[in-house]
Amino acid sequence: MKKSIKLVALLLTAGFYSACTQQLPPDTRSRISLEGNWGLQLDTAGTGIAPGWLAKPCTDSLFLPGTTDMGKKGTYNTDMTLTTALSREYVFEGKALYTKQVGIPEEWAGTSVRLVMERTKPTTIWIDGKEVGSNSDISTAQQYDLSSYLSPGTHALAVLVDNGKEAVPEKVYGSSHAYSASTQTNWNGIIGDFYLESAPLCGIDDIQLYPDAAKKAVTAKVLLRNPDKGTGKGFLSFYAEAWNTDRQHKTPVQTVEVDWTKPEQEFELALGDKALLWSEFTPALYRLSVSLKTDRSVDTRQATFGLRDFKTKGRQFTMNGKTTFLRGKHDACVFPLIAHTAMDVETWRHYFRVAKQYGINHYRFHSWCPPEACFEAADIEGIYLQPELPVWGNIDIDDSELCDYLLKEGRNLHRAYSNHASFVMFGLGNEMSGEEGLAMLIRTFKKEDNRHLYASGSNNYLGFKGKQADEDYFTTCRVGREDEKQFNTHARASFSFADAYDGGYLNHTYPNSEMNFSSANALCDIPIISHETGQFQVYPNYEEIKKYTGVLKPRNFEIFRKRLEEAGMIGQAHDFMMASGKWSALLYRADIEMNLRTPEWGGFQLLDLQDYPGQGSAYVGILDAFMESKGLVTPEEWRHFCSEVVPLFCIEKFCWTNDEVPAGEVEIANYSESDLNGRQLSWTLTDSKQQVLDKGVLPLQVKQGELAKVGTLKPAIASVRKAEKVTLGLSIDGTPYRNDYSLWIYPADKADKEVKAAEGICVTDDLDAHLKYLAEGGKVLWFPSKDKHKDQTVGGLFQTDYWNYRMFRSICENLGRPVSPGTLGILTDPAHPALADFPTEFHTNWQWFPIIKQSYPMILDRLSDDYRPIVQVIDNVERNHKLGLLFEFKVGNGKLLVCMSDLKAVQDKPEARQFYRSILEYMETPAFAPSYSLSVRDLQDLFTAKVKTGEMKKLFNISSYE
């Protein structure tokens, strides 16, 4: 039964504490660090522990904490062809024996002694040649009770670490990010804290804390160790103090007598009316000290907690009663220099601070659980965490080995990390299946620990079956099966072609800022989190290669760079990265804003803010694998659309003629701490020269947690007399919250008229009929037939390719589905005279949609290395084609402009008409003077000859697609 703590006068008179307000004594446990050089034997033959192996003198050594990779032990990796991930320089998989002589001091006699290895792989321990036991914990610290093995004096300690495939269930070894070659690799070693510890025989084994923000109290469950059942009286004392905030708050020392009939003592500690709450905005933490005093010893332990209540209310999350929105990122343990998780608080704090600069308040750990340092850092920085079990795929209820292992791992990590305020959610793993197995796991964990919200996994059944029983929230890409060629159940805006028609909303739908996920949300009555939002590829940044100074080598980068060099485009590498990256950032913004525009939506988890170096090399981040900027978008720019407060402009399209009225609704997504009442939103419409075309204000009355419609804007655009990109800026006065939207305005007197070529310009889709005219000095605009040149062209992809081309091409071909065109957007020169009347950046933007969707870029590999199309399409790292959407040649005495987009099919769109008009006007000017000459024969070969393509090996996903 729970007790309320009260002061015990007996202890005060006994002199245990002189005043109820002073602190408890510090943790006095003695430790011996095991850091240093250890003898090393590698079972390279895979024979296992042979007789006498322990007595065999070691001929090698390794510094621990560390890994065999870091010590350059194992086999040198001679494979220079791997492109699916970064390459380990040295590889070892199997059993490694680490040995060391340790000295035990006299004062440790008669104490409880334990060995702690904070993170490792399955182990077996020997003391002086005698086997102690084994441990297979991989998500938490391994602990061995060595009290009966270590007397004062010198002892031989041997630790066998096994990272072989037989050491854990196959599903854990083969799928999870605890073992994955894609990120942290299957390392062997011991990392993090590594020590022996002495404690009183009668002491504190564990402290579990259950904060209650509403009651401003915390319940402590203290597990005691008392081998001597005849021990006399014992007293537990408690003291809590806020330690990371300017606002001081502490409790008196409070003491109760121990009931030795119960191994676990449960008490409620009231924190008082001045108690501080923990959240992303005010991450106030308390350090609770618990001291056990008996007649013979004192044992003091400490635990950190935050006073918070993270719950669901309808379809949304709440923190301490206030509605919150999860702006999350996926984490797969990407640490390229060390190839294992960081084990120190400062590294994790740095990562979280970078993420917060980009508006992130939530991390999802894909099929792995981070270490203690991560939780500590998240507590301090105010980040909401969702760790997962080390598994991805099917859980067969009849697979007792796997189910028992996952139950053990789950119980361990809840016991190890649940005190942390940042640990607010828990998922069973990634893209799971197996209803009975999942139900058994989630029901067990929910019954045993109610401090978190629970999900049966992330994107289970790829969302086709909807939410699962017992889930508190639903992380998914869809809510049930969508209607044919529709996206009505989708919970994110982009998909692979294997998983959704035409890649989903963004690639298929005419650009707008109105669409959201309301139709999917209506199908679920608990909070939805968009699973792995984004996955928009960015061309690799080869300047990053020099950063890889650790155990992982960027051989994939080097191969991709060599391929581009062989394709004659190495000089464009940086431009490819910048153009695809700028476009990728805009696509991420569109997906994020779709989430924010959805009423009563739970949040999203990006894949990703940073690159993912494995599974085919998925460069999907606006930051690199080191969480460092690629120079694509500043944190300030990103926070305009990814923050606790975001002004949104909801409009049906981005391209207008100047006789139209671009009416749009302004909404405010307010997930800050407070209401936005009594403020005003200022808006301005500016042209390309920053001249103000229109402006106004809207009064705001926006409640906390609300997605509020605050007014309709109808900015005046009639004064825009030429084709121009204008910017609608929104800002909430007196705050840092602002956002802006690009609109493209085209003059109606031109845009509404049929586009016609001037006299002397031949427009055709059949060049053969006009070759004589061309050779004799004519000007020809050629729209080659898509059907006639399928083998020499690729398809038109608006967004950048999803995740990576190799994997989803393999999956699509296996399923018999259309393969994505695989391209990464356009690269052009905005100052080129062909684009003089078509405002554009050097990269894709929304006005290119109808042009690109009707395109079929031409493969120009036969041309010389220095040839550049006017509008080039960036290819992926697997094919490396030189692709042209708009390009020109001198043919004989004539001038040929080739457009690989069926512009006639989209003449209902003003932007397509404007593009058509701009290139025709260019052909009328002296600037139309192609310098690259082709003979008629070479031109015909370009459009008819077979294209050389290299062999691409198949690559599949762990998840299966229907």
Each language-model region and where it sits:
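Substrate-binding/catalytic cleft of secreted carbohydrate-active enzymes
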Residues: H362-L623
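Beta-strand-rich binding/interaction modules
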Residues: I125-I127, A217-V256, Q265-F267, V661-Q701, ...
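Active-site-adjacent substrate/metal-binding segments within catalytic domains
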Residues: G71-I104, W108-I127, G133-S134, P169, ...
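Extended acidic/polar, glycine-enriched regions
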Residues: S151-T154, R225-K313, S719-K753
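Accessory carbohydrate-binding/adhesion or oligomerization-edge regions at the termini
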Residues: T21-T81, A158-L160, G164-P169, I190, ...
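Short alpha-beta junction capping motif
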Residues: A758-R806, N893, C899, I919
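Accessory beta-strand-rich segments of carbohydrate-active enzymes
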Residues: I32, Q41-A45, R88-E89, E93-I204, ...
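Catalytic beta-strand/loop cores that center a nucleophilic Ser/Cys/Thr
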Residues: N507-N512, H789, F808-P910, F928-E962
